[in-house]
């Protein structure tokens, strides 16, 4: 199971990095500038995401990260996307421009009831994927994972509801 989750994670990261640069003038607007992200995201959220990415990059011991830090003036998006932890990657995606999130939703056929890209489902699914991946990596029981209630006690983050309607009655 972990093998396939890692494949999905790598695919989503790669596609997001590609689309992120494409939507930012083919990488001319670097990932560490706030205008590379959605105008709907708060400045605080964008700055937190960029700061987390910088922190994780600076702690990386990977040779290619060290090479870029020593020999170049900036770290390319693909390296940042590859190196940051899954939670930070999800934050990068969540704060990305609408064209990025909608392209990923379309790629995985994640639509809402009005046939619009369902970014909430995408982000929620990635958080669940992260939790399942972490459980597998630590040899924990996957069936014991449960959703914790959101801080505001709302039903936000409920990602299974749309799938129930799609399941056959015999399931």
Language-model regions, residue ranges each:
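Amphipathic alpha-helical interface elements
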Residues: 1-171
């Amino acid at each position: 199971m972990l093998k396939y989750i890692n494949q999905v994670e790598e695919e989503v990261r790669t596609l997001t990095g590609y689309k992120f640069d494409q939507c930012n003038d083919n990488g001319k607007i670097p990932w560490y500038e706030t205008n590379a992200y959605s105008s709907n995201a708060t400045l605080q959220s964008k700055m937190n995401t960029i700061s987390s990415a910088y922190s994780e990059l600076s702690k990386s011991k990977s040779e290619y990260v060290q090479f870029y830090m020593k020999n170049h003036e900036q770290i390319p998006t693909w390296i940042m996307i590859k190196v940051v932890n899954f939670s930070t990657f999800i934050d990068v995606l969540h704060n990305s421009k609408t064209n990025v999130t909608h392209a990923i939703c379309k790629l995985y056929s994640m639509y809402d009831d009005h046939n619009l890209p369902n970014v909430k489902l995408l982000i929620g699914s990635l958080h669940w994927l992260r939790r399942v991946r972490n459980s597998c990596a630590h040899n924990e029981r996957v069936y014991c994972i449960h959703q914790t209630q959101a801080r505001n006690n709302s039903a936000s983050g409920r990602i299974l509801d749309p799938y129930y309607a799609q399941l056959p009655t015999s399931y």
